[in-house]
């Protein structure tokens, strides 16, 4: 996306937009943000059961993508009823508000093994590694949602 913007190549930018919306990898927002909990303002990131370093890195990268697109007139912050905000609130609730009673949806991913095959890995609880680590990633989504959109982003 950034290369498409920098080089003024709309075809490259559009490829990134399409991948973000309907791609087949975890670069698609609805794969990176794995599950939206009904009746809450929370959505679980695909990395949540792995560890919090990867979870928060995902938040930072998604925020950058959303901001790049927003500056081009495409509002990914609002995509799927503010799905990214729900993921930020979920990650912040666990990492910064230190809530331990958050809902969790089991996630199974296909890990490559040393024999060239696939070994499924089941994540059935929130990953604790790196929990509470300070990362400079929440200012962007907080400002966008609370100051530009006037939405509640208290945990973010």
What positions do the PLM features span?
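Aromatic-lined, polymer-binding surfaces characteristic
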Residues: 1-72
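CBM-like carbohydrate-recognition segments
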Residues: 76-156
